[in-house]
Amino acid sequence: TAPILISLHSFTPVLNGVSRTWEMGVLWDADRITAEVFMHELSKAGYLVGDNEPYSGKAPQDFTIDHHAEARDIPHVGIEVRQDLIHHADGVQKVAAVMHRFMKSLPARIEPTKLRGKQGGKTA
């Protein structure tokens, strides 16, 4: 089974006085395929999902993805979870259960050979 790199972080519900309505964010640059799987599955689970929100996966500072995934043609995605959803044990359990359910199917749904040059991403 080919590896898939998932960079998982959390974000604040409010930044500089502005509410951030997304419950989950899917960050991507070169790998739109993996991002679309995550956006679809998280939306299907009832979450309001941001496409490259609350941050952009196209930012040059995404060291983990740039250096460990894109450089090796490994399928990848950045996931941001709004902190108020995981502030308590029940919320952590719910998010973990949702992610676990569909992550088990990822290797069969994402082919590593589809990464570069076939979706408008970076080319070697």
Residue ranges and their predicted role:
Residues 87-120:
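His/Asp/Glu-rich mid-to-C-terminal helical/loop segments that flank catalytic regions of hydrolases
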Residues 123-124:
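Terminal accessory/targeting
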Residues 3-88:
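Catalytic cores of processing enzymes, dominated by hydrolases/peptidases
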